[in-house]
Amino acid sequence: RPRAALCTAALIAAPSLVNLLVVIEPLLRRKLGAWTLACGVALPAWCLGWLAKTALTDPGILPRLARDGRTSSMRGKTRETTVATTGRTTTTRWNDTCGYFQPPRAHHCSVCNDCVEKFDHHCPWTGTTIGKRNYRAFLMFTYGTTALCAFTMTTCGYSVSYRGLKKSGAAIAVFFVAFVAFVF
């Protein structure tokens, strides 16, 4: 699992570093250079921080119950039960793997093999399941990477228009990487 988050961190850090050293550095002599430099440092740091928070925070994994024979006693019986929560009636499902009826909005992650509260999805970029406890961090990571991609494409586009195509090979390459990341 940590390998996915490390690969994502490298995919954020490498183009950001090239953007800082090759694209933004020549722009420092321009009027907006200091602000561009500040954003060029702050946005990747923001993304990497929220990536780490997302990947390292427990998504809301529900502990498994000890095997006491109850699982085998559920065979052939009703696999769902109705539960009243906050004035609403909800149907919960029996989970053979974890040995209990899942709480409302909890689902079993097939990749991690755990039940997760308010399961959203298993994210291949962070290498973890997104659930109740790391959903906010994941959203902040997503917003940050979107802003970083837009910022990188803007600085690269400005660099190409300012310096010309012949002197902007690295800017074009970084723009392409940021564009693919933005679309993906």
Each model region followed by its residue ranges:
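Intracellular leaflet-associated regions of eukaryotic membrane-associated proteins
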Residues: 1-184
